[in-house]
């Protein structure tokens, strides 16, 4: 006894809406356009520089510093900022008081051994694709910007946390090539220790780490890695020294880990979804797509990952903290 005009069927496989009634679809699409324009208008004073936003230096400046000065990188995206306020954002990490406190500690850090990076969402968005810019505007609307700004120090100079997402979001795809080349330069002829989730398979079946001298891996949980944080930290300290470049991809856990290891004298880079971005770059993708055999965080927790049977990958694993 439900009127057909009220029925919307959600199709899980591709997250698109199918409408029983064409009029409902027209209304829905028009409402979406109105909401997009509202968010754009609300955000314009910040995009035009009429209202203040944090100082965030470019990804290229960031890469020059980590290469030349051999300093570490902790990245803060919307997930980390949300967890700092004990609100859950990423599906792969629940918020808790201890993680929130540690993230706040790292975010306030002004130590020269580590760069604190912040997603370049708060000012001009011209470099992003229309889809990406509209997504940022919608996210920052309805009081979210104001909540996030409570944690941001307007006197501090940050760097762009999107350094690890150089491809999909940006209009200029040549930019991605430059950033990927700088990353390859960072680990050229160096021993690297990857700290990654159990379904990540970072660098497997591509040439991202081809320039590295040696690759070792520590495998951690793909969800809620912070629950075994001390074990992960101790494992890294066991296998890394001041000559090792540690690369970690564990969501908010990586943000804290990069800080603790930097304070211990070990250069550590939070590489986030760099491998996914590189895979999309190689494929010429224009949206987030499945990468066979690899976890893609942006596709959600229901995305099925096939196990990669790769002997070289298995040989590189020195510890598993699951």
What are these regions (language model features)?
Residues 2-210:
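Electropositive, gly/pro-rich neighborhoods at or near active sites that engage anionic ligands
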Residues 120, 219-221, 272:
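Residues at the C-termini of beta-strands that transition into short coil/loop
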Residues 123, 222-224, 275:
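Residue-level detector of flexible, active-site-proximal loop/helix-junction positions
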Residues 191, 214, 267:
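Residues at the starts of beta-strands that form the adenosine-phosphate
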Residues 191, 244-245:
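Structural motif
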Residues 196, 245-253, 270-272:
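Glycine-rich anion-binding loop/nest that anchors nucleotide
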Residues 197-243:
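A mid-sequence, solvent-exposed acidic-amphipathic segment
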Residues 253-322:
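C-terminal functional extensions of proteins
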């Amino acid at each position: 006894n439900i009127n057909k005009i009220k029925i919307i069927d959600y199709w899980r496989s591709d997250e698109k809406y199918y409408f029983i009634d064409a009029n409902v679809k027209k209304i829905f699409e028009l409402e979406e356009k109105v909401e997009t324009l509202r968010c754009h208008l609300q955000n314009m004073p910040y995009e035009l520089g009429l209202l203040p936003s944090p100082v965030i230096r470019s990804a290229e400046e960031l890469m020059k510093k980590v290469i030349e000065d051999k300093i570490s990188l902790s990245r803060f995206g919307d997930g980390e900022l949300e967890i700092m306020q004990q609100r859950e954002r990423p599906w792969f990490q629940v918020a808790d008081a201890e993680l929130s406190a540690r993230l706040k500690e790292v975010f306030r850090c002004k130590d020269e051994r580590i760069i604190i990076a912040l997603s370049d969402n708060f000012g001009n968005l011209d470099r992003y694709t229309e889809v990406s810019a509209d997504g940022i505007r919608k996210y920052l609307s309805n009081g979210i910007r104001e909540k996030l700004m409570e944690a941001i120090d307007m006197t501090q100079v940050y760097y762009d946390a999107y350094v690890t997402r150089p491809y999909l979001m940006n209009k200029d795809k040549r930019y991605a090539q430059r950033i990927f080349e700088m990353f390859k330069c960072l680990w050229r002829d160096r021993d690297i220790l990857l700290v990654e989730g159990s379904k990540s398979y970072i660098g497997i079946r591509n040439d991202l780490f081809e320039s590295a001298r040696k690759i070792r891996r520590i495998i951690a949980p793909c969800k809620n890695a912070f629950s075994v944080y001390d074990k992960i930290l101790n494992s890294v300290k066991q296998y890394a020294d001041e000559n090792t470049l540690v690369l970690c991809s564990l969501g908010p856990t990586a943000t804290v880990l990069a800080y603790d290891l930097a304070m211990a004298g070990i250069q550590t880079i939070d590489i986030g979804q760099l491998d996914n971005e590189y895979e999309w770059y190689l494929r010429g993708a224009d949206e987030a797509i499945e990468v066979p055999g690899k976890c893609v965080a942006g596709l959600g927790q229901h995305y099925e990952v096939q196990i990669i049977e790769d002997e070289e990958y298995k040989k590189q694993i020195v510890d598993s903290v699951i």
